[in-house]
């Protein structure tokens, strides 16, 4: 490729920076001469571009091979962009798929302090039972499958803090109101990979729930499949958990 002439055009300079970024992203690591040849730029120009990327923290040089590669700052930047992506835009197709497979009500919630907020719901496709849950509803964590799924990702100290700051009351005869029992249940959730609401919030309603793990360390979202115990049998729950 013919060598391009130097220019002070800021647009072209930016273009070259991104060309180097894209090339390193594609190849993993490259030497100065490789990049220079591929882009058709003088070695001094490429070296200056690489030094700029290293200075800004987007690239690094292997001291042994002298080759250049991208740093994890790029990954961090991508993660921040993805965190801001509308969760519903990502989750809706999967929630609809779960609804089609199960025929039951499907919920998506996000954590709001010590509570959960329902942000999306698909009603059951079978039967006439309608649960009290609805979009915009705020609910305590301790007596729901989605809440327990989120709590299971938290350290014990934070779980106990949520518990102590919540009003713990019996919603049904099966609601867990003992912290030691809850800690045992959360351990089972971690082991199984899903949480169960076994008529703890509404009599006659059983839910299976799991977290949505994103690009940040903090788990903010969880989803559930909920239905009457006559359809959400133990066997059915195990099938849906697979």
Task: Identify the meaning behind each predicted range.
Residues 57, 118-120, 221:
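A structural microfeature
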Residues 174-242:
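Extended hydrophobic
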Residues 65, 69-165:
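Amphipathic alpha-helical effector-binding/dimerization core
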Residues 63, 111, 213-215:
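Short, acidic, Ser/Thr-enriched surface-loop or helix-capping motifs
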Residues 2-89:
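N-terminal helix-turn-helix
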Residues 26, 124, 214:
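Short, conserved catalytic or interaction motifs in soluble domains
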């Amino acid at each position: 490729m013919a060598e391009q002439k130097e220019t002070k055009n800021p647009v072209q300079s930016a273009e070259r920076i991104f060309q180097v970024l894209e090339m390193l992203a594609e190849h993993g690591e490259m030497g100065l001469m490789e990049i220079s040849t591929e882009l058709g730029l003088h070695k001094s120009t490429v070296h200056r571009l690489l030094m700029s990327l290293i200075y800004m923290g987007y690239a690094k040089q292997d001291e042994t091979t002298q080759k250049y590669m991208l740093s994890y700052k790029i990954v961090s930047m991508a993660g921040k962009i993805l965190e801001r992506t509308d969760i519903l835009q990502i989750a809706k197709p999967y929630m609809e798929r779960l609804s089609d497979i199960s025929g039951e009500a499907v919920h998506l919630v996000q954590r709001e302090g010590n509570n959960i907020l329902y942000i999306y719901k698909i009603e059951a496709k079978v039967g006439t039972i309608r649960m009290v849950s609805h979009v915009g509803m705020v609910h305590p964590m301790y007596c729901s499958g989605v809440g327990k799924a989120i709590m299971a990702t938290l350290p014990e100290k934070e779980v106990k803090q949520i518990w102590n700051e919540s009003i713990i009351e019996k919603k049904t005869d099966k609601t867990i109101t003992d912290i030691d029992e809850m800690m045992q249940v959360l351990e089972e959730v971690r082991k199984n990979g899903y949480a169960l609401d076994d008529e703890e919030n509404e009599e006659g309603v059983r839910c299976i729930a799991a977290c949505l793990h994103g690009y940040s360390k903090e788990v903010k979202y969880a989803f559930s499949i909920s239905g009457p115990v006559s359809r959400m049998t133990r066997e059915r729950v195990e099938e849906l958990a697979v």
